[in-house]
Each structure stands twice: as C-alpha cells, then as structure tokens.
Amino acid sequence: MKRVEKRRETIQIKTEFIKLDAFLKLCDAVQTGGHAKLVVQDGAVRVNNEICTQRGRKLRPGDSVEFENVIYLVE
C-alpha cells in the first residue's frame, strides 16, 4: 500500500476562534459554504486527528484540520 505524503499549511486567524466551515473556505479547501457543509457531514474532515461532523465547531490557535491530504494548522 502506497503511503500518501500530507502537505502542511499554516493559516493565521485574526479572531479568538473561527468555525470549521468558515475555516475551510478561508484556506481555500472548499469554494462554498454548501460544499463545506457536505464534506463535514460526510466525515471527510478531521480536527485534531478525530473525524468531525460539526461544521460549527470552533477552531482556535493550536488546532489542526485535515482534509484531502492537507493538514491545516490554525495559528
């Protein structure tokens, strides 16, 4: 089985927290809020290494979001 190398990106937020669906749009992982809702509901997103199905989940600096072989670090 081939191991997929995951790319890492650091995304800075200017507020105390950001909701998961807004974060996915901010880092250009998805194009629309509707797409963000679908990928989160489908269990395609991991937050801090756990599958997350709450699109309103609050992300804070230090959290990580994994989607489509990219790990986004919230800073």
Regions found by a protein language model. Name each.
Residues 1-27, 51-75:
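Ferredoxin-like alpha/beta domains used as RNA- or RNAP-binding modules
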Residues 30, 39-40, 59:
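Short, well-ordered loop/turn sites that connect or cap secondary structure elements
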Residues 33:
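C2H2-type zinc-finger recognition helix
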Residues 42-50:
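Short, structured beta-strand/loop micro-motifs enriched in basic residues and often containing a Trp
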